[in-house]
Amino acid sequence: MSFDDLHKATERAVIQAVDQICDDFEVTPEKLDELTAYFIEQMEKGLAPPKEGHTLASDKGLPMIPAFVTGSPNGTERGVLLAADLGGTNFRICSVNLHGDHTFSMEQMKSKIPDDLLDDENVTSDDLFGFLARRTLAFMKKYHPDELAKGKDAKPMKLGFTFSYPVDQTSLNSGTLIRWTKGFRIADTVGKDVVQLYQEQLSAQGMPMIKVVALTNDTVGTYLSHCYTSDNTDSMTSGEISEPVIGCIFGTGTNGCYMEEINKITKLPQELRDKLIKEGKTHMIINVEWGSFDNELKHLPTTKYDVVIDQKLSTNPGFHLFEKRVSGMFLGEVLRNILVDLHSQGLLLQQYRSKEQLPRHLTTPFQLSSEVLSHIEIDDSTGLRETELSLLQSLRLPTTPTERVQIQKLVRAISRRSAYLAAVPLAAILIKTNALNKRYHGEVEIGCDGSVVEYYPGFRSMLRHALALSPLGAEGERKVHLKIAKDGSGVGAALCALVA
């Protein structure tokens, strides 16, 4: 066989292998139907009392955590409140001034979480919450020095705490950590009340005036923030035809929340439900924690790459399997694993004779960000030069034009699967709550936050296409308005503190 023939045969083998992988990543309309039906089933199961012997930490179903928020803002609320937000990489403290006209202003300070708090398994709760309190003190010195100087005589300042990890929440201001997901490994925090841990450190560091009155997460915050800033929140009375029904995040992680009828949240004690209904409260926000959807893998599409990422590379094997197929944290990692695999099969990057010779960035888990994929996704330059530069900059990886064509195909298959799967919880919630049929026109708004839904090219279009292919159908999809909700974790937490 001549060199040319060998080259063509290899090229055909590469195309065949890549096409097969792309097929494995396809989510068909039938699969969307199956997943949506199962999601609704898991929601119902999660709203019911847990089976005997089951806990939120051990259960593989949807957590469906009551957020103890029974109303949504309408944009007329006023006041100055504090908000703290512990995410996967940063801690942020804000002072939010609600103006009462759907607008707000904010002072904020963001701090990177030190690597030793993330990586060291010997770190304690006191280490972490001590760091949060020190950053809060620095913020108070800068923006509220007068209140700080008054000490115990200062007027209480309400703080809403956005804590974006699964908690077993028992009231608006208490919740115990179920498990860490992104980043942290601090074992002694699991099972403890995170509000109490933060409050103790605030008091210990001379800030008794700060009262942590509400525990929320970024998703509930996104929903509340969208309700506050949306002109359609009072649509029932204003005559507008759309209203906010879901808050969701598609960023580093993914999650969502929605308003559920209190009568249907049978996991809440009967006396509490009766008390709330007597007070005229009919609905409560449910934090779905949908990153955990189908942890048993009964229906989720699964490739060998998903298995490796979950079992060998993630910090929480067996959990958050939906998130590992959808969120920005994992999109680049899926591509990286595919490239390493295709190299090992002798199909791509053959200038490197062995895995050991591959660029270190390519063999290091989580080195390839979804931002790189977003550049490749829309590259239409000659010879895919943009892709070439992106791979050189991010991975120090030289590629041929032929390889780049195949890599772009893979990127588009990975992102399409992510967007199609992202449509499943949205379709399921809209169907379960009958949101599209509640009144004439029945148009709804979904408040979205997160880098993937906001910035990834074509993600929202692909998500909408999947909604049209889902049981909602094209007619249902047309009634859905996806809106970017800005800064849910700051404003939303402040709004949570306001209702406390």
UniProtKB/Swiss-Prot annotation:
Gene3D superfamilies: 3.30.420.40, 3.40.367.20
Binding site for ATP: K110, D487, G488, S489, G490, V491, G492
Record keywords, A-Z: Acetylation, ATP-binding, Glycolysis, Kinase, Nucleotide-binding, Phosphoprotein, Transferase
An annotated GO BP: D-glucose import
Domain Hexokinase, chain residue ranges per copy: 12-498
Name of the molecule in the record: Glucokinase-1
Gene Ontology MF: a single term: ATP binding
Gene Ontology CC terms: cytosol; mitochondrion; plasma membrane
Region (Hexokinase large subdomain): 217-487
Annotated positions of the N-acetylserine modification: S2
Organism: Saccharomyces cerevisiae (strain ATCC 204508 / S288c)
Reactions this protein catalyses: D-glucose + ATP = D-glucose 6-phosphate + ADP + H(+)
Pathway: Carbohydrate metabolism; hexose metabolism; Carbohydrate degradation; glycolysis; D-glyceraldehyde 3-phosphate and glycerone phosphate from D-glucose: step 1/4
Modified residues (Phosphoserine): S2, S470
Keyword set includes ATP-binding: yes
Family per similarity comment: Belongs to the hexokinase family.
